[in-house]
Amino acid sequence: MVINPDGTVQRLCKLVPTPFDLFIRRFLPASINTHLRRQFELWESGYNKVMFVPYLSGCFMFLRCTALKEVGLFDERFFMYPEDIDLTRRMAMKYDTVFFPNVTVTHEHGAASYKSLRMLWVHAHNLIKYFNKWGWFFDNGRRDLNRKTLSMLAEGNQK
């Protein structure tokens, strides 16, 4: 589990995003987008159990070398921001990508794209490359991974 320096949980277990998810999350105030964020960031899981998650943050992850060799390294086309979405998505398509709440690390989230127009441009530019790779609106892989995740959470299944 990744926590902030003040001890609060960083909600880094997520569904594979749609362009709409990322737009809402980035540009609408939390008071308006809370319901969508709760589902996208899997709040209902409680972040207190081992669970399958198709998109895990790149700030802290362990990967099997054999799996990494099979699915490939980070995609160099987008160095910053969607690289962890792409890698964990490719891993989740062949392996279980799993959140373990029993290990805790502290991460000071920089949120550079919220503080700098240049970094916001880099973020947007790389997201365009990501969605060009996987599909903007019609993405069966995203749909299937997200359905699997939500179904497992609804059933209370753990890994």
What kind of feature is each model-predicted range?
Residues 1-15:
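Conserved donor NDP-sugar-binding/catalytic core segment of glycosyltransferases
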Residues 13-19, 115-118:
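Short, hinge-like loop/turn segments at secondary-structure boundaries
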Residues 38-62, 146-159:
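Short linear elements at protein peripheries
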Residues 51-52, 59-61, 65-79, 85-106:
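Catalytic donor-sugar/metal-binding loop of nucleotide-sugar-dependent glycosyltransferases
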Residues 86-89, 93-159:
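Active-site-adjacent helix/loop segment of glycosyltransferases
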